[in-house]
Amino acid sequence: MNYKTTERLEFHELLQYFENHLMQQIMPFWLENCLDHERGGFNNCVNDDGRLISTEKFLWSQGRALWMLSSLYNDFDGDPKWLELATPIARLLIDKGRTPNGDWFFSLNVDGSPKKASDRKSVV
């Protein structure tokens, strides 16, 4: 469904457009390329063809992925697969994401250990 930028759309048309884009493009890309089934969490440093360019796991991305999957379950279709996919991300955040004083780490290494700011390299 392609629209010209000058075309006026009804709300239900916009909603359908974005639902289709989410479910036919974004989620399949994420599910195929970004979930870390071995260690939990979400690989957010991938290029447009899905190639992993860094294994660093940024906590804000973990939270975003957790929210998206939970929201799909709670607000979209109630499919239990969304909770199954969200659970390892939640587990990573709960088990590895916090400092001893309760703050959140900025990012984690592939093994779940905290990434030191001095070890961070640009992925661009």
Tell what function each PLM region has.
Residues 1-124:
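Glycan-recognition and catalytic cores of secretory/periplasmic carbohydrate-active enzymes
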